[in-house]
From Swiss-Prot:
It is found in: Cytoplasm. GO terms for molecular function: ATP binding; histidine-tRNA ligase activity. Pfam families: HGTP_anticodon, tRNA-synt_His. It is an enzyme of class 6 (ligase). The gene is hisS. GO terms for biological process: histidyl-tRNA aminoacylation. GO terms for cellular component: cytoplasm. Its EC number is 6.1.1.21. Residues 424-435 have a biased composition (Basic and acidic residues). It comes from Haloarcula marismortui (strain ATCC 43049 / DSM 3752 / JCM 8966 / VKM B-1809). The keyword ATP-binding applies. Signal peptide: none annotated. Belongs to the class-II aminoacyl-tRNA synthetase family. This is Histidine--tRNA ligase.
Amino acid sequence: MYDSVKGFRDFYPKEMQARRWAMDTLEDVAQRYGFREIGTPALEPTEMYVDKSGEEIVEELYSFEDKGGRKVALTPELTPTVARMFVAKQQELSKPIKWVSTRPFWRYEEPQQGRFREFYQTNVDIFGSAEPTADAEILAVAVDMLTDLGLTGEDFEIRVSHRDILSGVLESFEADVDVPEAIRAVDKRAKVDHDEYLDALAEAGLSYGQADTFDEMLQIDAEEIETLGDLTGSEDVRTATDNLQAVLDAAEDFGVREHLTVSLTTARGLDYYTGVVFECFDSTGEVSRSVFGGGRYDDLIEGFGGQPTPAVGFAPGHATLQLLCQRAGVWPAEELSTDYYVLQVGDTRPTAARIARDLRERGHVVESDVADRSFGAQMGYADGINAETVVIVGEQDLENDEVTLKEMDDGEQVSVPLSAFPGDYDRPTFEDFAE
């Protein structure tokens, strides 16, 4: 008897049916916006993450040396991969590029609520537009994904910030500040106690007094963020606040501004983020961690050897989305769904197989007996797979040139002429033949 590996999960059919619904919903929204599906490898060179992703992800890599002596890693995230893919075909691709991909990723971290060592995400990215409209479209896709899953604005909150505001404020202090390290501290602000957070800012180069001032500035009211440029005397901060406002204005045009909250304590810990960043949270706090996040990474393509290319994207994680949907009561029941079970009694397989094939050709989920079971065993199986309708094809039925249609929810049944079933009906049921 073997157990599954810690942090890795099995998904049985009932669970997968609900998960498939969620994945299809996310991908359908992206495709309605014109995002095109791509496929990506499970392995990448380890050095790609060492160079591009930041210390936290590098520490969590599943990395090893393959039989050819190459250092490789299971992909912990997709953004570096799609950046590499974009650079490889940059001259051939018509821009802007809009890509979507759903697949598993791997990080060696401690499993906890909504976090596993193997996890699934749907990545959505735009390459080739620096316009606030691109940021707003990404935010609109995120909101539409959530609402198409059945969530309402009362269920979630998307917190929006700007990395250039954070870096500009940090650089305005007269201190030798490690800006990326300080931003990583901000990203962990809600996950550690306040003193530990201030210690992290101090380790990044701020004095404790400056750290307190910086933290107070992060909590400024959204309506007053534009004053940060004057407070800091930083032109970079002024430019960033203008850009953030332009994104919010575009989000208003997309119809999603009401779902966005400006929060400068939102930072995103990965080093490659540049401009607008955002994270989605459960508005009740019951799902304690971020549901998903995203933002701009305008420098990453150039860092991969490509021409300077602005980019923006996000990646909803399926595990945390499931937690949010379950908390809100919109996650579908984890049960099998079968339209028809074609039950055969005696030597009736040719007719039963023909009926099953006809129903499948109409797009229905149809099962039939493949184990030579008794009538009672087949009925029990039909109930177990949640079949809506059972088509009974018995020898006595066929002698009368008919089959029996039985609805499983109420037990009603009716005899139907064999020549009339399935007939011209797209979804033939008891009601179509009852007198």
